[in-house]
Amino acid sequence: FIAFLKKGPNRNQSKTEADSLQKLHLAHLGRMYELGFADISGPFGDDGEIRGITIYNVPTIKIADSLANIDPMVKSGRLQIEIHSWWAAKGFGLR
């Protein structure tokens, strides 16, 4: 499953609050990777509506959605999640 991390409706945090949320967000993504729930995560290099992606390696979209929505950035409303079923073409994987 691929999760698009998009700008959320609540982006009016102070710089201190936003920096704190960013640290918690990165810790959350690190845990998802360490626990084997996510294969890769990362931001986009522009300031567009879609801020980044996470590719979840879990059996159901419900699990992917639950994991994505416990991200502190999502819980705060700074980001919102859009999840889709996704798979690599046969024979292609992450390197």
Residue ranges and their predicted role:
Residues F1-R95:
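Conserved, structured core segments of small domains
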